């Protein structure tokens, strides 16, 4: 299931340090069976290989998954989480969400 507003396979955020040129991301995204991708979640394609989300995983709304990330099977990723490029997460991973609060006068 891919919910509305999700963006899958966009170019990752990568630049060559000396020339400041954007790095071409020519890889892809693999999403396993029975996986849910929440609204307004972004999953960037890999530089060369694959960004991969394992089967039976649940990705909440407003999650950023960067290029070359590998997420195992049965993962649960809550809202507003950002996963940096080339991170490798194993099977049965679960995490909390990000929250922000500021005083209201």
Descriptions of predicted regions:
Residues 1-105:
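Structural signal for interior beta-strand "rungs" in well-ordered beta-sheet cores
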